[in-house]
Amino acid sequence: SIKDPNTFFGSHTVNHMILTNEQTNVVKDEISKSKEIIEKETGRNILHFCYPNGNYNEGIKKIVARSYKSACTTRAGFISKGSDIYSLNRIGINEEMVTDWRGNFSKYVFMFSLFIESVRR
């Protein structure tokens, strides 16, 4: 539910444009309007951004930094103390990573999946 305090939302642009292919004014508009729309719909302050398709550059990072506390890429990996908060790696989560052989959620399967991911990296 949108009102659930344990549900978090981030911004991702309005039209899923590849920002590195767009003019600066379009980039600013896509980033700011996405934030505005989600904040209006949820009644929450949107603090985090994800670059569409993972495409960004230093200029886009600076635009994002004006309105958000962090941003993630599509690069797989973990975050460490020295990670750039505007180009964070992430781990994709799918159903196989969180369910046991019966199809039920299992925190142990999830923890094991994260361990396997950390070893692979």
Explain the meaning of each model-derived region:
Residues 4-6, 14-17, 21-121:
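C-terminal active-site subregion of NodB/CE4 polysaccharide deacetylases
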